[in-house]
Amino acid sequence: MSLIVYFSSRSENTHRFVQRLGLPAVRIPLNEREHLQVDEPYILIVPSYGGGGTAGAVPRQAICFLNDVHNRQLIRGVIAAGNRNFGDAWGRAGEVIAQKCAVPYLYRFELMGTPDDIDNVRKGVSEFWQRQPQNV
């Protein structure tokens, strides 16, 4: 049990980060009309958009994915990518999703992440899943 579900825009920054993690992962399609449904608990990784407020911070594709009740019931945590140029709002998508889905905001990283970010997320994800009840 260590699935990562992620969205990456055409910039591919989040995609490259997830690839470097080397964990089982499924990508939310760029096309909002393409439906993805997962059948096991997962941690969501998303980029943050916008320059400050909560409106527009979460990618539309991630919103559509989470609007599926089945998908929303299986989210266990969120990790956000962002840009420090946004100041206090960097990684805001993680805050929004964590609050709306009542899950922990586990980590945030900038753009494609650093080697330290990769190590921190790998370790954190492993520890997170070890703490989860096995019958979930």
UniProtKB/Swiss-Prot annotation:
It comes from the Bacteria. GO terms for molecular function: FMN binding. One of its GO terms (biological process) is protein modification process. InterPro entries: Flavoprotein-like_sf, RNR_Ib_NrdI_bac, RNR_NrdI. Pfam families: Flavodoxin_NdrI. Belongs to the NrdI family. Probably involved in ribonucleotide reductase function. This is Protein NrdI. The gene is nrdI.
